């Protein structure tokens, strides 16, 4: 259970530093309310808050971790890279220190996309040898985790048919590791069971949850706090530190050669009846999240042609080999799929459509192919798509926040035999009404890629053979 207490001014100040403008917690009556300074009410402070040495303990927090896995001698320890071993060592040292100081064993693993958070976590589970729950935001990540848990030879159960069926199955067949989706936590009976019977809780892609909202995960961490808890993310939300306040971020020296190619082109102004109708909604509430900006961009015929020409040229010249193309809209995705499958055929071009029930089979297939083009949306590919062999990324959309950008770029930052990674962006549009907006958001992608993730801008002078760039240079010199 969380720590029920009044919040004095000093603690309130610390909490506001983490939460920002508004701080919401459950009060002692179970209401999720905003906390104000000098309140006389009592609130439930998540135990994970006290995992940081900067927060004074209200009382010692001791947990008995006695839910050992069966057949612990059969566990296979995974092989880690040196930089992953460094993280695992630091985490285990932190856990040991927390036990000594009677603080909660909560750690956020803030590790870059492609670092290997899944295998590193499996190593930690192998060391703990305690029963664990792995909580995922969606089913798309299940296969990735299932393969990883199978590799360490621990008895596990994957829940795909709902929490009710899982509870029935656990009566017949106990499991050392459960792989679930987060909506299972809306079931109180299930929460009580894992609180009692499981010691470790892993919240994968923790940035997907805003724990300042009254969500199932927020309630679970408040009322059924795990004994050992790991948050995994490449792009942490600061507010979530209230629930897991010790962050380990070990930078690794990557030997990947990462480049970002900026394909600039000065278009003649283009429009159509469809575009003109959508332009009317640009400065209205309909475009609050830039949905119409992206819809208009998807209708940009000259820009779409430039993207296609660039992809075809680079793929035929083997400049890119294992390529992922991402769009914001499904319609835009289908446009590129239709054109590219006509050019290269179904043995090369694959569709990453979340609506396709066989999508996991497609992802599995491309992992074994030497050259392919995989076309998907930012929604499907942004988090959890695990194809380590990807070496190139074409971004057709523009409007993304920093977290989304880093997640998308992370699709090609995983370790594989190939060491070169290329991102291709298109900062120009032929539609004058969104010209500056597209330029602004594309520059945001470029800046984050270079300054935070270590990509290098390709010198345009060294790429005059490339069709799209060559056309752009010719236009500029006329």
From Swiss-Prot:
Question: Record keywords: Hydrolase included?
Answer: yes
Q: The Helicase ATP-binding domain covers which part of the protein?
A: 98-254
Residue ranges of domain Helicase C-terminal in the record = 307-454
Q: Does the keyword Ion transport apply?
A: no
Where is this protein found? Virion
- The record's EC number reads 3.6.4.-
Q: Keywords, A to Z?
A: ATP-binding, DNA-binding, Helicase, Hydrolase, Late protein, Nucleotide-binding, Transcription, Virion
* Alphabetical list of InterPro entries matching this protein: ATP-dep_DNA_Helicase, Helicase/UvrB_N, Helicase_ATP-bd, Helicase_C-like, P-loop_NTPase
Give the signal peptide as a residue range, or say none if absent.
Answer: none
List of residues binding ATP? 111-118
Q: Which SMART domains match?
A: DEXDc
Which top EC class applies here? Answer: hydrolase
**Gene Ontology BP term (one):** transcription initiation at RNA polymerase II promoter
* Role this protein plays: DNA helicase which seems to act as a postreplicative transcription termination factor. Involved in ATP-dependent release of nascent RNA. Forms a stable complex with single-stranded DNA, and to a lesser extent RNA.
Its protein name is Transcript termination protein A18
What taxonomic lineage is listed for the species of origin? Viruses, Varidnaviria, Bamfordvirae, Nucleocytoviricota, Pokkesviricetes
């Amino acid at each position: 259970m969380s720590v029920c207490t009044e919040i004095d001014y000093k603690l309130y100040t610390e909490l506001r530093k983490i939460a920002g403008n508004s701080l919401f917690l459950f009060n002692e009556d179970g209401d999720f309310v905003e906390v104000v300074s000098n309140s006389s009410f009592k609130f439930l402070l998540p135990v994970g808050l006290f995992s940081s040495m900067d927060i004074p303990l209200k009382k010692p927090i001791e947990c008995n971790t006695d839910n050992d896995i069966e057949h612990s001698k059969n566990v296979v320890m995974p092989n880690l890279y040196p930089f992953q071993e460094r993280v695992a060592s630091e985490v285990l040292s932190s856990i040991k220190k927390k036990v000594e100081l009677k603080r909660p064993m909560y750690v956020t693993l803030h590790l870059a996309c492609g670092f290997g958070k899944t295998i590193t976590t499996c190593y930690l589970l192998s060391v703990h040898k305690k029963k664990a729950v792995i909580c995922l935001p969606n089913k798309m990540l299940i296969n990735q985790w299932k393969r990883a848990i199978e590799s360490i030879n621990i008895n596990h159960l994957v829940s795909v048919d709902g929490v009710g069926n899982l509870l029935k199955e656990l009566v017949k067949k106990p499991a050392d590791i459960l792989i679930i989706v987060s909506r299972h936590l809306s079931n109180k009976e299930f929460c009580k069971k894992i609180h009692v019977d499981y010691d470790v809780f892993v919240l994968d892609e923790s940035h997907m949850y805003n724990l300042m909202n009254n969500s199932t995960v927020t309630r679970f961490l408040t009322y059924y706090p795990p004994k050992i808890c790991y948050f995994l993310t490449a792009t942490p939300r600061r507010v979530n530190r209230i629930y897991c306040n010790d962050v380990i971020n070990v930078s690794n020296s990557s030997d990947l050669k990462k480049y970002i190619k900026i394909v600039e082109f000065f278009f003649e102004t283009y429009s159509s009846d469809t575009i003109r109708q959508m332009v009317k909604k640009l400065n209205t509430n309909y475009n609050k999240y830039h949905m119409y900006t992206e819809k208009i961009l998807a209708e940009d015929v000259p820009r779409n042609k430039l993207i296609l020409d660039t992809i075809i040229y680079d793929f035929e010249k083997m400049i890119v080999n294992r390529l992922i193309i991402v769009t914001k809209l499904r319609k835009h995705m289908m446009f590129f799929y239709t054109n590219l499958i006509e050019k290269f055929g179904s043995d090369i071009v694959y569709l990453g459509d979340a609506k396709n029930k066989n999508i996991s089979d497609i992802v599995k297939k491309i992992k074994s192919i030497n050259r392919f083009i995989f076309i998907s949306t930012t929604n499907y590919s942004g988090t959890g798509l695990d194809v380590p062999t990807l070496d190139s990324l074409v971004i057709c959309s523009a409007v993304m926040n920093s977290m989304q950008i880093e997640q998308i770029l992370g699709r090609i930052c995983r370790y594989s035999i190939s060491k070169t990674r290329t991102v291709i962006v298109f900062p120009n549009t032929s539609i004058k009404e969104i010209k500056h907006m597209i330029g602004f958001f594309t520059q945001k992608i470029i800046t984050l890629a270079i300054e935070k993730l270590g990509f290098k801008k390709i010198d345009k002078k060294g790429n005059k053979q490339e069709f799209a760039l060559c056309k752009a240079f010719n236009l500029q010199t006329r």
